[in-house]
């Protein structure tokens, strides 16, 4: 059970740092809302630990600090699954969730792997690569939410992953300019090249034009397809959980609608939704959930998962979760450690041979 003080700290962290999820979570039943706040708080801590790991804005030094932040998160996750969490509210709360719900370790490890990809500065040549990244930093959270609702049906898990993918594609579309000014690009490189926009040109001078608008539009169309398909899985969730998940779907899709209203300009403008809009979507979500038992079934419930999320579906559907580190995470962490050792050797060499 999550300690009340830890839950209060997690709730405050989400209230001030994740407005969209905080709004949607208000429609979840308390038995799901409490562990979901712990889950999102731990994910937020992990994300912030890497995003905020900077060293005076120097690109090379920042990358080193980010690598060390990921390695520290690895150790924190080990402590969580060892039943000895770090003495911090989010860690203690998430450890309680892991124990109560038998959370498959592969799911939070997937998030950590995605953060490790950020730390090594990975970019993505194709849309499939973007989905690989989105699977780790967002669809994994969708799968974990299903576990908190005690739903492990593979079809429902696949649709939850669709929703996570769609949300992350929306985030990428919203943050095109912010990311570019930080030297990062999450858009598919081949889509940019098809529009005649070299990635290096855009990173050197992030300006809005028809080329970047077209890529952003295309990404949001892909998100819309996934949002629509994700709806088929909502009816596989407990009735009391459906309003909150519909709300998450509508609130995040609404960000994409705002980007469209801005002419697909995410370089000079940042899309946001108002409190009034969120209230409207919360009302719509409650209505849709109330009517959901009387609606027809949807054939897309049984659609195969996107190949990039199949490993998440398989992990979450297992009756007995694996507790050891996955091979994928071991590989990317080894890469981070090797880079760290190389930098240390270079520094020792520089001190031994001063100019």
From Swiss-Prot:
Gene3D superfamilies named among the record's database cross-references: Farnesyl Diphosphate Synthase (1.10.600.10)
GO molecular function: 15-cis-phytoene synthase activity; geranylgeranyl diphosphate synthase activity; metal ion binding; squalene synthase [NAD(P)H] activity
One Pfam family matching this protein: SQS_PSY
Any one Gene Ontology BP term: carotenoid biosynthetic process
Cofactor(s) named in the record: ATP; Mn(2+); Mg(2+)
Enzyme Commission code: 2.5.1.-
Record keywords, A-Z: Carotenoid biosynthesis, Magnesium, Manganese, Metal-binding, Transferase
InterPro entries hit by this protein: Isoprenoid_synthase_dom_sf (IPR008949), Squ/phyt_synthse (IPR002060), Squalene/phytoene_synthase_CS (IPR019845), Trans_IPPS_bact-type (IPR044843), Trans_IPPS_HH (IPR033904)
Pathway: Carotenoid biosynthesis; phytoene biosynthesis
Cofactor: how and how many bound: ATP is required for the transferase activity but it does not seem to be hydrolyzed during the reaction.
Keyword Manganese recorded: yes
Top-level EC class as recorded in UniProt: transferase
NCBIfam families: PhytnSynCrtBRhod
Protein family (similarity comment): Belongs to the phytoene/squalene synthase family.
Function: Involved in the biosynthesis of carotenoids. Catalyzes the condensation of two molecules of geranylgeranyl diphosphate (GGPP) to give prephytoene diphosphate (PPPP) and the subsequent rearrangement of the cyclopropylcarbinyl intermediate to yield phytoene.
Protein name: Phytoene synthase
Organism, as annotated: Cereibacter sphaeroides (strain ATCC 17023 / DSM 158 / JCM 6121 / CCUG 31486 / LMG 2827 / NBRC 12203 / NCIMB 8253 / ATH 2.4.1.)
